[in-house]
Structures are given as structure tokens and as C-alpha cells.
Amino acid sequence: MEYGIIPPEVLLGAYAQGVFPMAEDGEILWFSPTQRGIIPLDERFHIPRGLKKALRKKPFEIRFDTAFREVMLGCAERDGTWIDGVIVESYCALHELGRAHSVECWDADGLQGGLYGVALGKAFFGESMFSRKTDASKIALVALVERLRERGYELLDTQWMTDHLRTFGGIEIGRKEYLELLQEMLRGESVIDSLRLPK
């Protein structure tokens, strides 16, 4: 891997096949879970009642793609992280190509939380999120869903399912069903085309 990063064409090619990387003990491991976590972008998406109250207070300014690297580093702060230097540089390279994006929660004290992920076809692959202040990552997730709906996306892939994501309507589907859905979302999308820089 040149310069210690996963080449963008390799990374996007993996996503197109339902595979994603995680770092462990200095190695890059590749995963394709038998049960895949997704958050439906239709009426099944649910905002928990307590979070609705927080949203009404508008505690953060939401920004997109203004601090991608900082969001990644925030996600890497927690113990047992799978985000190492290779992962950071690899996704920053995708971000420069317009294929990886961040959602950020800011206040007067700075960046307080957010998330990042990869966009391909009508699918968005959520990678990781973090919070420095209460509800920041949850509010970023709601902002992401709103933006994905506006842009015509139909799949939010969370990779793994957690109790936290279930509160938003997250579900698990089998690998076969997921791959069929993914191919539908990528119809007409070319990994080669997606690597062309915007004019």
C-alpha cells in the first residue's frame, strides 16, 4: 500500500462488495458481517423522545465537511479504537476525492462531536461517531439522515448493530439480503467514475 494508505480504488471497491476495513494491532483486517446493521431512511427512522427535546434547544451548529480529519481523530480518541494512522490517512484521501464526508456539531467551545462515512451510489456507509458533549453524536446522526433524505440516498449502512442504533430504528439484515440491496443502491455507479475529481 503506497505511503501506508489503502488506495482509494481498493477502498471503494471493497465497499462496493460489502467489505470494510478496521485496524487491529497494526494490521488492516477486512470484514463482511453475516448480519448487517442498517438504519432505514423511510418512516421507520425514529428519533427518541428525549433527543427530540434536545434538538428543539438547538445546542449545536451543524456543519458538513469542514473538519473531516478532526472528526476522525475525535472518533479515534476512545479506548480500543480500530482507527489508526493508516485508516485516518486512507479516509482523508477519500474525503479529498469527495467520497467521504463528515457531519459536525460545533458550539462556542469548538467541535463537540460528529460522525464520518463513505458515500457511494445511493448508499452511505457510516463509519464512526463521537461526542464530547451530551447528545452531540446523536444530533449529528439526525442531521445526517436529513441530508441523506434530501439528496435521494436510500441506504444508511451502520455495519454493526448496537442497542444505541436500535433506538433510531436500526435493524439487522442477513448478508445475502444486504448484498442484493447494496447492488441495487450502486446500480449505474462506477468506482472508476467515483474517483474522478470534481471539475
PLM ranges: what are they?
Residues 1-199:
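N-acyltransferase acceptor-side catalytic subdomain
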